[in-house]
Curated annotation (Swiss-Prot):
InterPro entries xrefs: Peptide_deformylase, Peptide_deformylase_sf
Entry-linked CDD domains: Pep_deformylase
Lineage of source species: Bacteria, Bacillati, Chloroflexota, Chloroflexia, Chloroflexales
This enzyme's EC code(s): 3.5.1.88
Name of this protein: Peptide deformylase
Keyword Protein biosynthesis: yes
Species the sequence originates in: Chloroflexus aggregans (strain MD-66 / DSM 9485)
A biological-process GO annotation: translation
Gene: def
Length: 188
């Protein structure tokens, strides 16, 4: 496995690739398993929830998503895992149905680290995709973080960046500057 360089929206050459319409993946593909492993390693190293192949310079219809595990605090203060991490590999994904209702979400992207803005997304989506073996799947009514991530990553496969979805550009902000501006408490 290898950590790949994530292309950046604010780099002119990278942006050309990020704006491309990605080509479908022809399955089976012996090299795809290694690419997917590299993508997961890259995404984890960047503390992301999703990553699309064009973000690492490969304009194909492939994206990965991993929803972090959820924990519940016990009376003794310990944590138990109530929902394990959910990794998804979506090859040639197509959103085939949407809720018809939008919600505004604060959204960021590994291709523009530290920047967030309010983006309208469907409350749920149904997506069809293939897995690494070429088997077809349908994920119905994906909502919450998973539904949001699917919409974000599928946008990447069509050359659409999250900044293009922002309706009110005044919501786009660099949270690293917000963090730097916060007062630091003295430690004893």
């Amino acid at each position: 496995m290898a950590i790949r360089r994530i292309l950046r929206i604010d780099d002119a050459e990278d942006r050309k690739i990020l704006k491309m319409q990605c080509r479908p993946v022809k399955l089976p593909d012996r090299n795809l398993k290694q690419l997917v492993a590299d993508m997961f390693e890259t995404m984890h190293a960047a503390n992301g929830v999703g990553l699309a192949a064009p973000q690492i310079g490969i304009p194909i219809q492939l994206c990965i998503i991993e929803i972090p595990p959820e924990y519940e605090e016990q009376p003794d203060g310990s944590l138990i895992e109530v929902n394990p991490a959910e990794p998804y590999v979506l090859i040639n994904p197509r959103i085939v149905k949407t809720s018809g209702e939008e919600i505004m979400r604060d959204e960021g992207c590994l291709s523009l680290p530290g920047w967030y803005g309010m983006v309208p997304r469907q409350t749920w989506v149904t997506v069809e995709f293939q897995d690494l073996s070429g088997k077809h799947h349908r994920l119905r009514r994906a909502d919450g973080l998973l539904g949001w991530a699917i919409q974000h990553e599928v946008d990447h496969l069509h050359g659409i960046l999250f900044t293009e979805r922002i309706r009110d550009l005044s919501t786009l902000r660099d949270i690293t500057k917000e963090r730097e501006a916060q007062p630091v408490e003295a430690k004893a």
